[in-house]
């Protein structure tokens, strides 16, 4: 895997996602598209959901994966990796980097962004 610092300075990261209801949303299809992207020059992929992250990690074990989990909650407009459960799910599935909503909006369980980041650093050893 390419060191994260190098990735952030150069290269192409391809977002490999499909909307709900799409026949392309199948984890095997997502993994195949991610592999094709990596074989053709992408240095990493951005994936949505633990299921897709896990499928790509199994198929492309050396891939740089930026993971997120889109979730809707009735009491919050935060959508991208909104809380601890989602952070933990993305990380456990095999993401190297966790993408999350970095706004100060109210999160589903009232968690603060700073607290979530601190917890991820401590419990997941995410830097």
Where are these regions (language model features)?
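Alpha/beta enzyme core
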Residues: 1-127
């Amino acid at each position: 895997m390419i060191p994260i610092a190098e990735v952030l300075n150069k290269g192409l990261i391809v977002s490999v996602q499909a909307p709900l209801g799409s026949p392309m949303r199948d984890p095997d299809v997502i993994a195949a598209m991610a592999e094709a992207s990596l074989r053709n020059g992408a240095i990493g992929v951005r994936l949505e959901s633990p299921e897709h992250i896990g499928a790509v990690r199994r198929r492309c074990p050396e891939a740089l994966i930026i993971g997120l989990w889109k979730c809707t909650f009735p009491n919050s407009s935060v959508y991208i990796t909104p809380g601890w459960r989602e952070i933990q799910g993305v990380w456990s599935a095999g993401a190297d980097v966790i993408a999350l909503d970095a706004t100060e909006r109210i999160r589903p369980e009232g968690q603060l962004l700073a607290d979530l980041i601190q917890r991820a650093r401590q419990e997941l050893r995410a830097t």
